[in-house]
């Protein structure tokens, strides 16, 4: 009986060495997608704790921008951002692409917050984005 148990245990040892996880793909595509909040308005969640400080203390107020201006800038900046993401450039800063539809009416609050994300990345990481206005870009 001891020999049978020993034989079964020896037979099972190789199976315990196999990985239980499925291997990840070389390049996973993560995208930030806008979502609607409880009020039905588009909202953007930024997880960086310094972003709220930046928005309240450093960023220009929302009254300085028009919605059409922000939409135009965001369209260009999202394309530039996604180009960097897809090429693997600035991988330590840009960890996901952005799913943004310029035909969608997101509202000025969303457009403002998205634009300020680009200004914030420029401010914090000194990442040069060509679509930023001269007064918003850190040189």
What do the PLM-derived regions correspond to, one by one?
Residues 23-139:
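Short beta-strand and adjacent turn/loop elements
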